Amino acid sequence: DTHGLPIERAVEKELSKKKIRKESLPKTEFRKLCREYANRYVNIQKEEFIRLGVLGDWENPYLTMSPEYEATEIRELGKFFEKGLAYRSKKPVYWCIYDKTAEGQAEVEYYEKEDPSIYVKFPLKKEIEGKKAYAVIWTTTPWTLPANLGIMVKEDADYSLVEVEGEVWIVAKELLENFFKNIGKTYTRVLKDVKGRDLVGLEYEHPFVDRDELKGYLSEETLKNMWRIYPSEFVSLDTGTGLVHMAPGHGQEDYTVGKRYNLEPYAPLDDSGRFVEPAPEFIRGVRVFDANKLIIALLKEKGYLVHEARIRHSYPHCWRCKNPVIFRATPQWFIGMDIEYEGKTLSGESLEEIEKVKWIPEYGKNRIKSMVENRPDWCISRQRFWGVPITVFYCENCGEVIKDKEVFERIASLVEKHPGGTDVWFEKSPEEILPEGYKCPKCGGTSFRKEEDILDVWFDSGCSHASVIRPLGFEKADLYLEGSDQHRGWFQASLLESVGSYGEAPYRSVLTHGFIVDEQGRKMSKSLV
């Protein structure tokens, strides 16, 4: 594997010693430096593997950055477009605010993190029994509150309307005693109990966001539907209050419910995680985690903060830079797990193929099966430089995505013949890459721009069956051998890519091995710093 962010970061580090910023170089120049760096370490690792006694065809290794490999990868990608499985959409994905790129499920690791744990009361528009009424929510991500568009409840759950210091608070009946114990308060009386469905449709005011400031930024549909209580199957009564703050731009479940009720995935952040317009002025330019204390202070000042504490919990971190990631809605390319093609879905067909493979040890089957069953659509785009580009064009006139099979084949042929492989995509103009006189199939336009995102490196490695095994005359590999972390990595990426392209698993059997660890049980195959 010769592409990816670790190499970009290493090259950036070398450039910084010379006081050179990556942004000051043309993409082609930066990619050239990445290629040189990768080649240098391919040779070093090759020598080390030989010294260790590892057997391999060392004179003919396959490299994911070779023109032949990259050309095959582009053809494989073209098949997903041809079947209608690849699509572009704005929805929440893991986002590293330090590396400024989307990340996939296989690129996050969970570590303990300390965060605020706050209860906030949202004022309802209507009074209850002549008293000001509030929907009380719990969150560990105060920085997502500026993007709040709704509150979710469990339809068939019981909710208590309780009187507290002359106000009416709404909390799930099942969580009532625990909630008041947590906040160190008591309630005067229960006015009545209602079902969650009875709360649906109630409107509320945002504690610190002005509706008028969102006009011109959010759609009319969103402005009309936001700041109401909505039913959701994702609400649990394990912790919190049974009322869940919904930010469709910052959570997968929030996005699913928001889409159902025409609430757009709103996320007023830039790539480095700083708030931008139309976020409230007091947090503009502030990074998400730094904004927590400012938001909490304002809630306290306005009287909407019910209780504040700290919590240690398992939180996703970037596997490369080890910093916490966020969920952020951005336009990305996805491969759909449940899109129907030829009467099948990628998810369904992959699960069928898992049953045909021999898994050693046997627990590997259930492990990968549960991961495929529960995984979201595969986010395949990355906002970086060193990798295989997503080779589609956009019509400048109508915005149509150009994804013709013939165009993919033409690009793959150009890549195959170029010594720098996919560097040709970055060196040539759309006019030089597209067939002469090419016109947009939708509007007849003749002006195009190239997609700038690159492919997830897991798509790179997942293509090895097509780039290496099949050219040797084999339909599939007898054995894939790797560590248990690859059930969500290489084993899974290879399975999805092969099933999407050929309708079958790329391997007959999969063997999972363990790890050499240090005295604390940490894998020594990774940096221990």
Swiss-Prot record:
The lineage of its organism: Bacteria, Pseudomonadati, Aquificota, Aquificia, Aquificales. This is Isoleucine--tRNA ligase. Its EC number is 6.1.1.5. Gene3D superfamilies: HUPs, Ile-tRNA synthetase CP2 domain-like, Valyl/Leucyl/Isoleucyl-tRNA synthetase, editing domain. L-isoleucyl-5'-AMP binds at residue 482. It catalyses: tRNA(Ile) + L-isoleucine + ATP = L-isoleucyl-tRNA(Ile) + AMP + diphosphate. Catalyzes the attachment of isoleucine to tRNA(Ile). As IleRS can inadvertently accommodate and process structurally similar amino acids such as valine, to avoid such errors it has two additional distinct tRNA(Ile)-dependent editing activities. One activity is designated as 'pretransfer' editing and involves the hydrolysis of activated Val-AMP. The other activity is designated 'posttransfer' editing and involves deacylation of mischarged Val-tRNA(Ile). A motif ('KMSKS' region) lies at residues 523-527. It comes from Aquifex pyrophilus.
